[in-house]
Amino acid sequence: MAKRIIYNENARRALERGIDILAEAVAVTLGPKGRNVVLEKKFGAPQIVNDGVTIAKEIELEDHIENTGVALIRQAASKTNDAAGDGTTTATVLAHAIVKEGLRNVAAGANAILLKRGIDKATGFLVDRIKEHARPVEDSKSIAQVGSISAGNDDEVGQMIAEAMDKVGKEGVISLEEGKSVTTELEITEGMRFDKGYISPYFATDPERMEAIFDEPFLLLTDKKIALVQDLVPVLEQVARAGRPLVIIAEDIEKEALATLVVNRLRGVLNVAAVKAPGFGDRRKAMLEDIAILTGGQLITEDAGLKLENTKLESLGKARRITITKDSTTIVAEGNDVAVKGRVEQIRRQMEETESSYDKEKLQERLAKLSGGVAVVKVGAATETEMKDKKLRLEDAINATKAAVEEGIVPGGGTTLAHLTPELEVWANSNLKDEELTGALIVARALPAPLKRIAENAGQNGAVIAERVKEKAFNVGFNAATNEFVDMFEAGIVDPAKVTRSALQNAASIAGMVLTTECIVVDKPEPKDNAPAGAGAGGGDFDY
């Protein structure tokens, strides 16, 4: 395909036009009085969102060069989303402001490479300052504040996430599901839970609720298919003599073996239930080993030279209670703390080594299940459109609270960045010179941009508000919900330091790339052929 090549100022201006379009579409959502954006969907109802990265992903322009600008700034939003899970709109607004300021200097003849170096040094200084100003999150009140700000000033959601964090701890997983009612509910599971239920409904011990509940059961874990009942007979006899229930977790149980277990269960010979192993492939084996460590048992696998028919009672796991429904199993075990701690450390090391975000997520889930912490927020809404919007807001809120626990909190509402402007100017003037100094001052002029936009979305004069905030103490900022200047910590308007830091780093990185662009190569749009007369009108020889 033929290419179109654009140089110098023309290239940068075309990128800027694309960035302007995206930044404006995203910036309308910023702050407590930010509006929503409606996204048309090819299939189904339109989606109403208030989430920067979701809007950025939807924007595709006709002009290839402008579209390149959109793609670059979209990267700032999605990288911030990957790192901190929130702050995507802030990253977009910041990147836009740095690009705008920077392009003026490049057009006036400044050296773009030295400007970029100044921008990078300024970012390094600001990251350190954010770290110094961050306060650790100590109580659930602070967590609730972070959660409610990220969910669009919804105090109920903040409270719910704080409660979930309190129950499942730092390592725990808080997952989102679409609820069945209009209200949003929180469900907390004690113990390890996985999404596999009993193989046959005949295993249910409570016919009304269709649940199988076992107290003090033995647990047989194997990664093979159980085809012959003869393999199980020795274990079943030992368990029957011990007079305790047995739960079998295996890859699968074939009809013959399953029928025998069901008959024994119905006749009251043996209280037994069978469940398919969770996961698949290597992950299935790892999860079975997790369950074995949690219950103090052994995974019966031929890789380790262990056979089902030779299994002794000592190899079986023991749990305090196991609850099985048609689509989930919950194991509550205790007393194997040392082994579990060792396993948790091992999973943590794997998380540090892996590059894949998917693997990281799965390892985090395993970590949470071992630590005994899984909370499910069931999102409730009257319509599907509202449900999707709520789900995105809740996702941001959960990510923001986790980020706050990791690196602490700073004053929110764009306040921190605005207050750092004078600090950066003083530092840059005494440590940098020439065009590097200009690069750092570009960042200083761009820092109040998120605060200005929050004020403008609330119907105020952004530039005036930003100047007034800079004159006040570090913790004092502009509360756009009430149009007052308040102590942000006391008012509960806080941002996770990690979110502010990630937004700044990614914005500066992308802006630096745009400023140092000298040439763009894009596909040349193909001329549209005029369709021949009569085409598409339906041939006369066919009946339709």
Curated annotation (Swiss-Prot):
Coiled-coil boundaries: none
Enzyme class: isomerase
Annotated binding of ATP, by residue: T29, L30, G31, P32, D86, G87, T88, T89, T90, G413, N479, A480, A481, D495
Record region (Disordered): 525-544
GO molecular function, one term: ATP-dependent protein folding chaperone
Domain of life: Bacteria
Pfam families: Cpn60_TCP1
Biased composition (Gly residues): 535-544
Any one of the GO BP annotations: protein refolding
Gene Ontology CC: one annotated term: cytoplasm
Catalysis: reaction(s): ATP + H2O + a folded polypeptide = ADP + phosphate + an unfolded polypeptide
Function according to Swiss-Prot or TrEMBL: Together with its co-chaperonin GroES, plays an essential role in assisting protein folding. The GroEL-GroES system forms a nano-cage that allows encapsulation of the non-native substrate proteins and provides a physical environment optimized to promote and accelerate protein folding.
Family the entry assigns: Belongs to the chaperonin (HSP60) family.
Protein name, as recorded: Chaperonin GroEL 1
